[in-house]
Amino acid sequence: YFYSGFMFFYNLGRNHKMPGSAQEIRYINRDENTHLWLFRNMILELKNEEPELFTPDRVDVYREMIKEGCRQEIAWGHYAIGDKVPGLTKDMITDYIQYLGNLRCMSLGFEPIYEGHEKEPESMAWVSQYSNANMIKTDFFEARSTAYAKSSALVDDL
């Protein structure tokens, strides 16, 4: 249930409303993208180590799981946002979530689950400008670091 929520705040941000909230959502989105990258890599490694888990029948089950997740995300977006928020429509929500479902499938080496949604919808290209932490440029002297700070670990010799 992330992207329907993210796009609501990003829509506010692109309309110059609540920019601080949009920035906070970007931090959350960045963290979720880190989790996405981690689990994608774990699944790809599992594909190499345990290929019997990725037979055509099992891949069909996995694709159906992704499709069900998309269905629930779309239903939530329609309920929470619907056609009541200026700048967002149910069709935009559906198109974008179906695109993300295809993106997730293809990144795992699976066939897309939604025909015609292999590319980011033009009506939603602005979401990428907010969701990709590397795409928004700021004035170097006015910007705060958004990177995680490295800490030195104490070594316990017990």
Positions of the model-derived regions?
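Non-heme di-metal
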Residues: 1-158
